[in-house]
Amino acid sequence: MAAAQPESRDGAAQSAKPASETDPLSRFTCPVCLEVFEKPVQVPCGHVFCSACLQECLKPKKPVCGVCRSALAPGVRAAELERQIESIETSCHGCRKDFVLSKIRAHVASCSKYQSYIMEGVKATTKDASLQQRNVPNRYTFPCPYCPEKNFDQEGLVEHCKLTHSTDTKSVVCPICASMPWGDPSYRSANFMEHIQRRHRFSYDTFVDYDVDEDDMINQVLQRSIIDQ
C-alpha cells in the first residue's frame, strides 16, 4: 500500500490543516460531497473541489467558496493531487477490502456492506420524524460543547475547538448538527474533533435548503450521492 505523500502544491491549503493528523485521507476529501476527489480542481483561494461539485457551487450569481467564503471562480486541474489519488490505497469501511482512492467511490456505490455501514450512521444522526416538533433553532451562533464559551459562528467554533480542545476525548453533542432539521440533540459524537473538522469545514447556508422537509432533503442527498458516484 502506498504511503501518504509529502505535502504538494495542489490542495496545500487543505492538506496543511490539523485534520490530516487525525485522518490522513482528509486532504483527498472534497469539502462539499465529503467523498474522495473526482477530477479535483484547485480554485484561486487555494481550496480544492471535485469538478462536478465546483460546477454546482458556481451556479449562484455571486458564488463563494464554501470553505473560506471568499469569491469563487473557476480553477485549474490539481494534477499532482490527482496523481496521488491514483496511487494511494485505502480500505472500504464496509467490506474492509483495499482499493486505490480513485476506485473507492465506484466500489462503495455497489458494496452492500458499505451501504449497511452508512445506514447505521444515518439512523444514529437522524431524528425520528415524530419528534420533529420544536422551535426553529439558532443556526448562526453556537456554544462550545467542551467549555462555557459560546456565540461562535461555525468557522469560529471549528477554530476554537482545534486550538483549545484538540486533545479532549469526551463524547459531546455537536451543536451545529443539533441545530439542523435532521439533527438529534441527544446524539453524542464519539470523535467530535474529527467530526467537526471534516463535516463542518464549509457553511451549510451555502448548500442547504432549510425549508425542505426531512424526507425530501434525505431523498435529495441520496440522489446527489448516486450522481456523484
From Swiss-Prot:
CDD domains in the record: RING-HC_RNF114 (cd16540)
Name assigned to this protein: E3 ubiquitin-protein ligase RNF114
Entries under InterPro entries matching the protein: Di19_Zn-bd (IPR008598), RNF114_RING-HC (IPR042716), RNF_E3_ubiq-protein_ligase (IPR051438), ZF_C2HC_RNF (IPR034734), Znf-RING_euk (IPR027370), Znf_C2H2_type (IPR013087), Znf_RING (IPR001841), Znf_RING/FYVE/PHD (IPR013083)
Pathway named in the protein's UniProt entry: Protein modification; protein ubiquitination
ZnF C2HC RNF-type span: 92-111
Function: E3 ubiquitin-protein ligase that promotes the ubiquitination of various substrates. In turn, participates in the regulation of many biological processes including cell cycle, apoptosis, osteoclastogenesis as well as innate or adaptive immunity. Acts as negative regulator of NF-kappa-B-dependent transcription by promoting the ubiquitination and stabilization of the NF-kappa-B inhibitor TNFAIP3. May promote the ubiquitination of TRAF6 as well. Also acts as a negative regulator of T-cell activation.
SUPFAM superfamilies in the record: RING/U-box (SSF57850)
Molecular-function annotations in GO: ubiquitin protein ligase activity; zinc ion binding
